């Protein structure tokens, strides 16, 4: 192989690696949120429902808005996209 061909192949591999790394880093830290309607929001039930529905690492359930009666709250699931 000539010097130019080797250099071209090296540059193409380098650029593809840089693009892959930047895309992976860009989308790996995003957090998604989904509301689940509940008749009576309880934190343990909310965590369990979120964990079974979204089987991912870092799933957390929270009853929102805080300070309201459980009947008026909804379950907010947060997880890594």
From Swiss-Prot:
Disulfide bonds: 32-81, 41-63, 46-75, 50-77
Transmembrane segments: none
A GO CC term attached to the entry: extracellular region
Keywords: Antimicrobial, Disulfide bond, Fungicide, Plant defense, Secreted, Signal
Superkingdom, taxonomy of origin: Eukaryota
GO biological process: defense response to fungus; killing of cells of another organism
Keyword Nucleotide-binding: no
Locations listed in the record: Secreted
Signal peptide start-end: 1-21
Protein family according to the UniProt entry: Belongs to the DEFL family.
Name of this protein: Defensin-like protein 130
Organism: Arabidopsis thaliana
Lineage, opening ranks: Eukaryota, Viridiplantae, Streptophyta, Embryophyta, Tracheophyta
């Amino acid at each position: 192989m000539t010097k130019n061909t080797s250099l071209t192949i090296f540059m193409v591999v380098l650029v593809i690696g840089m693009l892959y790394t930047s895309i992976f880093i860009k989308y790996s830290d995003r957090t998604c949120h989904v509301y689940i309607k509940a008749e009576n929001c309880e934190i343990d039930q909310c965590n369990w429902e979120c964990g079974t529905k979204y089987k991912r690492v870092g799933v957390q359930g929270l009853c929102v808005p805080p300070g309201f009666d459980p009947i008026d709250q909804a379950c907010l699931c947060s997880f890594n996209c």
